[in-house]
Amino acid sequence: MIPVVALVGRPNVGKSTLFNRLTRTRDALVADYPGLTRDRKYGRAHLSGYEFIVVDTGGIDGTEEGIETKMAEQSLAAIEEADVVLFMTDARAGLTAADLAIAQHLRSRDKITFVVANKVDGIDADSACGEFWQLGLGEVYQMAAAQGRGVTGLVEYALAPFAEAMGLVRDDDGEVVTDERNYTEEEAEAEQQRLAEQPIKLAIIGKPNVGKSTLTNRILGEERVVVYDQPGTTRDSVYIPMERDGRNYVLIDTAGVRRRARVHEVIEKFSVIKTLKAVEDSNVVLLVIDAHEGIAEQDLGLLGFVLNSGRALVLAVNKWDGLDQDVKDRVKTELDRRLGFIDFARIHFISALHGTGVGHLFESIEEAYDSATRRVSTSMLTRIMQMAQDDHQPPMVNGRRVKLKYAHVGGYNPPIVVVHGNQVSRLPDSYKRYMMNYYRRALKVVGTPIQLRFHEGDNPFEGRKEKLTLSQERRRKRMMSHIKSKKA
């Protein structure tokens, strides 16, 4: 599982500052795909070995009319669906009526909540934070998000209860060990075999009303009962086991919860958090796009999260039937222009309602999964690395050329290639993209992003005092005695 952390508080207390600090470590991945913008409200964070979804719920006024009347519906949903709430306050401004109103709402939700007094830099923090105990939510944690003070400690403390469920390992000091796998040939084969034997987890995602539920019903070959909001309805996606052409799947239905707007109309209740959690839990993502509306900003936001998560990807442009040919040509041109950065993903033009093209989706889904989990040897990865280096030499750094030594598998789904060498931390992004594309072409990878990690080659003798071996000492003694005899 991957926990969800919601940032809650009135306007201008530093929620966006903390959000940017937590999520910026993932920006480099999105930056590898020009034309893709990162969502400013939902992000994937990685800190001290913990991976989590962070949500900026936006400012809450909390006026006397009642907290719920002034809180946006999406902010309420984020609090409901979060595993941890960081309730942010302004230590400089002190306790306000809005803070008290927000605290009252949070107490009624019975959520794991941490009160954060932000902007403690340059003031007497202990004195300033004392009044926030009145919120009745327990200990007050001091932070200066702009400078990064207190951020790591709070995240580690808040997410510690989830470490075991996240599969994290602790060392003897209780610290979380960051898992960057260094597979041996045997371990890589065992991991690949495990992935090959388990069902393919397929998440069908997309913005509201693009036809996800229709596509789900078409794939399953049956009309599923529409689930309406009722007290106690699960917030999680529905997991549906299925078999197709002798292969097992688990279909993750993110469109399982609906709300009825009018008596005869059903409108999907869209939950970004539920969708993001489904992406994290999947092997392959099927992103559904409405052909009538083209590429929307919400599509790009979901696409960015899929790429950051490293999941295999297939695109389905739905409602294709009935469009005039000139409209189809215009849609294809827009797709080429706006989605050129994911040229590795297959695009299908379908009609979920009539079943046109739906059967071919699974050919691409299997192809993408097989690419994401294909076994590749260290010798092959090193050979491809050497070919890329021969075709285009790495740049010079301080008069010395960056030297790539060897490469090996670092993980699957997504495929991770770990490259070792000298001064690799100074490689420009352009050369890293060149290497990534070279590996993609050489391995004929389709439907999945490839991640490259670069590790500096450690000098095993660095920091050691020179110490001669026994044979070297004997040789040195013979040489010294020979020199002395010649002088005599």
UniProtKB/Swiss-Prot annotation:
GTP 1 binds at residues 9-16, 56-60, 118-121. Residues 374-458 form the KH-like domain. GTP 2 binds at residues 206-213, 253-257, 318-321. Gene3D superfamilies: 3.30.300.20, P-loop containing nucleotide triphosphate hydrolases (3.40.50.300). One of its GO terms (molecular function) is ATP hydrolysis activity. Pfam families: KH_dom-like (PF14714), MMR_HSR1 (PF01926). The keyword Ribosomal protein does not apply. GO terms for biological process: ribosome biogenesis. Residues 3-166, 200-373 form the EngA-type G domain. Keywords: GTP-binding, Nucleotide-binding, Repeat, Ribosome biogenesis. NCBIfam families: GTPase_EngA, small_GTP. GTPase that plays an essential role in the late steps of ribosome biogenesis. HAMAP family: GTPase_Der. Associates with the 50S ribosomal subunit. Belongs to the TRAFAC class TrmE-Era-EngA-EngB-Septin-like GTPase superfamily. EngA (Der) GTPase family. This is GTPase Der. The gene is der.
